[in-house]
Swiss-Prot record:
HAMAP family: RNApol_bact_RpoA. This is DNA-directed RNA polymerase subunit alpha. DNA-dependent RNA polymerase catalyzes the transcription of DNA into RNA using the four ribonucleoside triphosphates as substrates. Gene3D superfamilies: 5' to 3' exonuclease, C-terminal subdomain, DNA-directed RNA polymerase, insert domain, RNA polymerase, RBP11-like subunit. The keyword Transcription applies. The gene is rpoA. It comes from Pseudoalteromonas translucida (strain TAC 125).
Amino acid sequence: MQGSVTEFLKPRLVDIDAINPTRSKIVLEPLERGFGHTLGNALRRILLSSMPGCAVTEVEIDGVLHEYSAKEGVQEDIIEILLNLKGLAVTLEGKDEVFLTLAKSGVGPVTASDIQHDGDVTIANPDHVICNLTTNNSEISMRIRVERGRGYVPASSRLSSDDDERPIGRLLLDASFSPVERIAYSVESARVEQRTDLDKLIIDMETNGTLDPEEAIRRASTILAEQLDAFVDLRDVTEPEEKEEKPEFDPILLRPVDDLELTVRSANCLKAEQIQYIGDLVQRTEVELLKTPNLGKKSLTEIKDVLASRGLSLGMRLENWPPASLAE
């Protein structure tokens, strides 16, 4: 392993130990000293707080007005039922939200498999217990809202001014959208040839079953890499301000020749030649103007002097004249 003293090692051994379908240990080595904690902490934070997923966000239970109620014939109180609903592991295909229904009666447990849903919804833990019915006459019916989101969103942050009109009995839940339920990492020493000061990163992660640990690590790494891309080439990524377009022509050229305040004789001669704007006039030469009926050298001298006082002259060339703004 010979290379430049400034060259960084890249991990070349990734070992994935699948403990069960939802839990894996992922080993990454060798890493430069200190990089184990740098990468481990960054990935851990992303996996816990920034992974997208689906979660129950609200529920309506027949006969229940608020979360501090108790329902006859049901072993759990409403708060316990809400906590159990938060444990549902759900995925949505092609939708951002769905409403699911659950209705059951008789003695026995009520599980996630009792929830009615279509093919766009997958429940990864169908044996998850929601509540237990205690008598033959017991029954429970509820409407469950599942949404797609990211990270952890408390119910209080979804309250709005319209909540005064929210139907009584619609209960909001704190939503944990991340499919990662538990993650821990440790850093051990690694050795490559004569170097013994390297790191080995070990990530122990468990998901809710909607996403396998290997894919979760892959997605978290992609998120981290995309966020760091901006630092690879430090540039101002803000939208450049639109520069104010300069006018194509000097505004004085767009003004009518009447603004030159010529004598009546000179002004009438120009009107007879359909010279309406100063931009029309400055493009004419002295020879062309002298051919105008009734316009003599005295009028020509007057026109030249008036134009000169405004920084203009005869015989000017104007590209793309007349502008579209003058078109009738």
